[in-house]
Amino acid sequence: MAERNTAEELDDVYEIKYSTDAMTGGADKRMYLYYQLADSIKKADSVDIIVSFLMESGVKMLLGELDNALKRGAKIRILTGNYLGITQPSALYLIKHKLGEQVDLRFYNEKNRSFHPKSYMFHYKDYSELYIGSSNISRSALTSGIEWNYRFSNKTDPINYEKFYNTFVDLFENHSIVIDDEELKKYSKNWHRPAVSKDLDRYDLQDDKETSNQIPLFEPRGAQIEALCALENTRAEGARRALVQAATGV
């Protein structure tokens, strides 16, 4: 039995369409970055995302819209960091499992340079727009966390748009490594939950309580997502039996 999609819950509590170029999070749901991103994904011919980390909670929110975008032929590129191990393996497994190889998913690969960008770029038939600010992909950062983000287009500010977009292309093409199955397995094997993740998880839990009146049902999370993805891959390879060994409580 699966928990109701967190994006659907938010859509239920806020049905009024509201467009803004400045998003600040907080208690006013009109200031949530999530609503503007979801609307942009629905219309875009291609999507480029660059964030310093991905968390399972945020990926779950965007999966539905990204999947719909792929089904209508949109191209999606995502560049994220493995800096300090904040990116959760379960978030990467979700993307690979739900969206497949259609998404070009990569790690920034310069070990001696910090990586803290947060930007979302959407390309349409006649123009492109770019969100830039402080939000990585986590539930709290997309909703009620105090995060400041601003949106502009290549029509309103073409010079600075080109600076940001060209830098993204350079980083993506020349300073990254593809997150294929082997790279993901290696990252997951070496990953240790950083101390800061406890705070980020607490923020997401608090936001979940504030924005949802739904009674949560059981859904896979964390290492459970990794195990289920591995089982599905095993079935796809033709195996008829498998054994999962895990510690109690995983």
Give each language-model segment a name.
Residues 232:
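Short, locally clustered residues in the helix-turn-helix/winged-helix DNA-binding domain
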Residues 1-221, 225, 229:
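PLD/PLD-like phosphodiesterase catalytic module centered on the HKD motif
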